[in-house]
Swiss-Prot record:
This is Transcriptional activator protein LuxR. GO terms for cellular component: protein-DNA complex. Belongs to the autoinducer-regulated transcriptional regulatory protein family. CDD domains: LuxR_C_like. The lineage of its organism: Bacteria, Pseudomonadati, Pseudomonadota, Gammaproteobacteria, Vibrionales. It comes from Aliivibrio fischeri (strain ATCC 700601 / ES114) (Vibrio fischeri). Residues 176-241 form the HTH luxR-type domain.
């Protein structure tokens, strides 16, 4: 990495830190794309507040026709980039997915993306503290572009900017409060023990309080997490990171 690239990266990082809204974030994404010589970009974070209907946040300049088709056809479920990003942290070149076998009954998302103008591309996985995940993707419509060279160039630059980008995006979008910030320590304790299969009586003995108190705390978690029963509260608390192994330290 030369001095010119370092200065450009520092300039973008400083600009990201001063972003006040998603429009500013979008402008920074556009500048990052220019630095790594890419035509398209997509920044997406999936918040698993619900298994059936997760909250998906996207900032991009992808072709509108492709985005509409992607959403209408429910391609999120079959997207190999999304699947990869769930459990990986290293960037990946999309050409890796071209070599993998696709089930006959499943749509070939990469091939369909290419037919819509996203010929080549690569992605950087994103993971948040509240079990959210996503990716920062870049693509190009030029089939003759040397993707491996672009990918290498991006891999030395984007990781320097991505942490600031994710942090400031989440800071701006504060309407998505972390569930663990609204639960009290006692409520977390009751949920954590309930997730271990303990009954109300068991939890009362473990925590040294009455069964009525345990029921009170668990009922409060339902209201705060917008759930209808104990099982759903446990599920949502785990999905959103409201309860985890070190809960007693919170």
């Amino acid at each position: 990495m030369n001095i010119k690239n370092i200065n450009a990266n520092e300039k973008i990082i400083d600009k990201i830190k001063t972003c006040n809204n998603n429009k500013d974030i979008n402008q920074c994404l556009s500048e990052i794309a220019k630095i790594i010589h890419c035509e398209y970009y997509l920044f997406a974070i999936i918040y698993p507040h619900s298994i059936i209907k997760p909250d998906v946040s996207i900032i991009d300049n992808y072709p509108e026709k492709w985005r509409k088709y992607y959403d209408d056809a429910g391609l999120l479920e079959y997207d190999p980039v999304v699947d990869y990003s769930k459990s990986h942290h290293s960037p990946i070149n999309w050409n890796v997915f071209e070599k993998k076998t696709i089930k006959k009954e499943s749509p070939n998302v990469i091939k369909e993306a290419q037919e819509s103008g996203l010929i080549t591309g690569f992605s950087f996985p994103i993971h948040t503290a509240s079990n959210g995940f996503g990716m920062l993707s870049f693509a190009h419509s030029d089939k003759d572009i040397y993707t491996d060279s672009l990918f290498l160039h991006a891999s030395t630059n984007v990781p320097l900017m991505l942490p600031s980008l994710v942090d400031n995006y989440q800071k701006i979008n504060t309407t998505r409060k972390k569930s663990d910030s609204i639960l009290t320590k006692r409520e977390k304790e009751c949920l954590a023990w309930a997730s271990e299969g303990k009954s109300t009586w068991d939890i009362s003995k473990i925590l040294g309080c009455s069964e009525r108190t345990v029921t009170f705390h668990l009922t409060n978690t339902q209201m705060k997490l917008n759930t209808t029963n104990r099982c759903q509260s446990i599920s949502k608390a785990i999905l959103t990171g409201a309860i985890n192994c070190p809960y007693l330290k919170n």
